[in-house]
Amino acid sequence: MGNCCASPGSETGSKKGKPKIKSNPFYSEAYTTNGSGTGFKLSVLKDPTGHDISLMYDLGREVGRGEFGITYLCTDIKTGEKYACKSISKKKLRTAVDIEDVRREVEIMKHMPRHPNIVSLKDAFEDDDAVHIVMELCEGGELFDRIVARGHYTERAAAAVMKTILEVVQICHKHGVMHRDLKPENFLFANKKETSALKAIDFGLSVFFKPGEGFNEIVGSPYYMAPEVLRRNYGPEVDIWSAGVILYILLCGVPPFWAETEQGVAQAIIRSVIDFKRDPWPRVSETAKDLVRKMLEPDPKKRLSAAQVLEHSWIQNAKKAPNVSLGETVKARLKQFSVMNKLKKRALRVIAEHLSVEEVAGIKEAFEMMDSKKTGKINLEELKFGLHKLGQQQIPDTDLQILMEAADVDGDGTLNYGEFVAVSVHLKKMANDEHLHKAFSFFDQNQSDYIEIEELREALNDEVDTNSEEVVAAIMQDVDTDKDGRISYEEFAAMMKAGTDWRKASRQYSRERFNSLSLKLMREGSLQLEGEN
């Protein structure tokens, strides 16, 4: 559920002292009751440590932010030990799916055994306004940042990282947990020491599974998504695919499946054509390429298991892997990939902060208006008529049908209130680029209609080394397409929309968007495996 741990230099611009959590002004029937008969009170955790976190911990400065909440540095009052506390605002949990994600994340962290490469859960609290997850503090920074900071990046270093990631996958699968969102950003170093352990930090999309069980919910990050996820029938093999994508990026600096649009990314994943021609692949060992091929095998039945990857000769002989530099090109690509992700994330965070209570205001009234028969459900015709009456922009019937099918979780051909909330939030964000303008304005502090290099540097001062002028210059060089030394709104929008949809500030939107895309590709026949009829 977002970055749970600290990044170096994140103190700048942070809030200090104990945070004040405002009361929650919005509850809906999508939420569960506390059984007290006192109205709708959202209860998330099954067995929290307690209700008042301040009795055991002091919350300090902010160290991170995600879609659902804020992560603070916190101190155990008795021992003085430092931890990270992820405080998830209940008003941001708009649907039953959001609630279940948080509940399951805590249950999975409790279930997982202590492991040197998995962030450990300390406590979990729940009060009327928020869920507070106290966990191990990681202050060593992100995986790619550490790689870029090193002067000499080699295949041997990549092999050591991959061994750690696969050991995490193996322990997860051994304990019946499918991660579903493996990506470089979800691995942090415990501290800044050269010998620091690399740790998996985010189980927000993870799920329990049984052998042979199939899943159809489309979740994850587009670049790392396995083809069978898009086909809506998958199992734990998806984690091997995602780790294979990470390996490819570690070795050459760019993702293996990339396009300017979500549909293009999805189609590239389905085609699964791996490019080993670009630099530095001619210098990469054949055993490394062999492992990439076997991890990015499009047929999950033929894909290696975590144990088989760990037994592969490239991993087994990691200390003997080539120690020759993969070149400055790879480091430069990794730096650009990492920092550009951070710029997008910062913009997405601004957008997400505008998708709070006001986004769902009026949704209940709209549902009641459309539900003319008072059945607690609305069908496609009622949805279409209601949207027209509310002045919603015209949506083609086929798109509306796809959206409705994606949101209709119980498959009864109608939308209940919880399902309607998801559709409404989706439509509000789909309507225009208002939120993208808000994000641009956040960076454009002097309101000149351009993001200048000083504004870019200021916006990223807790994301990158403030002395790293080359990083800021690289972003400006990449985004500033007309080379006038500043970023216009059009250039900013193009950057945000390249490769993945900026509107995935909302996880619910992401799910609905990819469900719709999957259905579209199914109808076009694009999701068939090679050789299928």
UniProtKB/Swiss-Prot annotation:
The organism's place on the tree of life at top rank: Eukaryota
Entry GO CC: plasma membrane
Signal peptide coordinates: none
UniProt: Ca(2+) 3 binding residues: 444, 446, 448, 450, 455
PROSITE patterns named among the record's database cross-references: EF_HAND_1, EF_HAND_2, PROTEIN_KINASE_ATP, PROTEIN_KINASE_DOM, PROTEIN_KINASE_ST
Residue sites binding Ca(2+) 1 per the record: 371, 375, 377, 382
Cystine pairs: none
Matching Pfam families: EF-hand_7 (PF13499), Pkinase (PF00069)
Enzyme class, spelled out: transferase
Modulation of this protein's activity: Activated by calcium. Autophosphorylation may play an important role in the regulation of the kinase activity.
Chain intervals for the UniProt region annotation (Autoinhibitory domain): 321-351
SMART domains according to UniProt: EFh, S_TKc
Domain commentary: There are 3 contiguous domains conserved in the CDPK subfamily: a kinase domain, an autoinhibitory (junction) domain and a calmodulin-like domain. The autoinhibitory domain (321-351) inactivates kinase activity under calcium-free conditions.
Family designation: Belongs to the protein kinase superfamily. Ser/Thr protein kinase family. CDPK subfamily.
Protein name in the entry: Calcium-dependent protein kinase 8
Species per Swiss-Prot/TrEMBL record: Arabidopsis thaliana (Mouse-ear cress)
Gene: CPK8
